[in-house]
Amino acid sequence: MTDFRIYFAGRDDIPGEFILGRDEKLDLLLVALPGVSCSIALHITLEGEGAEVNLGGPYLCPGNERLDISVTMEHKVGGCISSQDFKGIVGGTAQVGFYGRIVVAHDAQKTEAYQADHNILLTDTAKVTTRPQLEIYADDVKCSHGATVGKLDEDAQFYMRSRG
């Protein structure tokens, strides 16, 4: 059975640590809405074979918000799967930082881990810092990470606004 949790940044008390045992599954959605400034720090440990984590969520920072998301995903045993997928829209003078780290231990063979952070900037004064990292000590793994930060040009913004 999958444990599904939704947390709203700035409103909910978000636990800083999750530990998953054998065959446990966790779907974790983090949502940051406009007007919320906060730091979120998560440490997720997969210490039982067959454990699976799906983590991600949207953040919308159109004003002067300050948002930091720090995630450490630690694979201690093999046969586990983790996925991180964050997406942000940042405007105004907002500042967002994403610091993600996947650690795969030497004994964690057959690990599958994915990490992504994708952002759209709406203004020249908005700032996004994104640092996805992989720390892999095992040989037989499937791991990837990536990040994008792009700006919508004025024509694209006009088109979207004119369509509602």
Residue ranges of model-derived segments:
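Conserved beta-strand/loop scaffold segments within soluble protein domains that form the structured core
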Residues: 1-158, 162-163
